[in-house]
């Protein structure tokens, strides 16, 4: 494959959302661009931020395999940080495939988004078959993308790649497949979560919707009440806060700018449009 056209024609940034790594660009990439750049930069996905007629910006999320994700919690927070700093905003709205999401930019260490959905489609499932040592009881939830949450007593003993790949392609969740979250409850309000991500086809250092899914299921099965607050730690050891207030559910955590292409003058004053 030749040198990617996106590297020479477009500006892009490298972001991390609590360990979830992304390339962010302001124009729609080709499939070739996504595959090349995600492999070249060893990131989890590509965030395309464009102008929107109904929000401050529009976000399209590409997985590292080139497929489009309907939602990505950490990617959404990275996009909100980008838009907030481009336009000098605190309150930010982002149009996505799942609708318009509202968020708040306090600082790069604290970017919050309202992840509330009208129906989480939560359901406990007994798997038709499992690998040796794997729990049969799992929890399905739609947190913007489909997740299966598996509670374990000791995450250090879980073969995340093997079990994650098995469940991601499990016949019980065909044909779409699922993201898979392995969860250990460390304290009443602290979870450790390792996620195998569909579209990356491997464990990632962090997954926003996976942390959200795990916290929502934990709040139910451990009877934490309607208004709860849970800290979630991922493989990256970054903490994400998931909390519920007055029927709304929020995802809050850090965002980091890792690098930028030489011609990306993203801090230059902008009008309220991209492109």
UniProtKB/Swiss-Prot annotation:
Domain of life per record: Bacteria
EC class (word): isomerase
Locations listed in the record: Cytoplasm
InterPro entries: DAP_Epimerase (IPR053407), DAP_epimerase_AS (IPR018510), DAP_epimerase_DapF (IPR001653)
GO BP terms, alphabetized: lysine biosynthetic process via diaminopimelate
UniProt cross-references to SUPFAM superfamilies, sorted A to Z: Diaminopimelate epimerase-like (SSF54506)
Site positions (Could be important to modulate the pK values of the two catalytic cysteine residues): 147, 197
Key words of the record: Amino-acid biosynthesis, Cytoplasm, Isomerase, Lysine biosynthesis
UniProt pathway: Amino-acid biosynthesis; L-lysine biosynthesis via DAP pathway; DL-2,6-diaminopimelate from LL-2,6-diaminopimelate: step 1/1
A GO CC term assigned to this protein in UniProt: cytosol
Binding-site positions, substrate: 20, 63, 73-74, 179, 197-198, 208-209
Signal peptide feature range: none
Keyword Membrane attached: no
Active site: 72, 207
Function text: Catalyzes the stereoinversion of LL-2,6-diaminopimelate (L,L-DAP) to meso-diaminopimelate (meso-DAP), a precursor of L-lysine and an essential component of the bacterial peptidoglycan.
Similarity comment: Belongs to the diaminopimelate epimerase family.
Assembly and interaction partners: Homodimer.
Protein name: Diaminopimelate epimerase
Natural source organism: Chlamydia trachomatis serovar A (strain ATCC VR-571B / DSM 19440 / HAR-13)
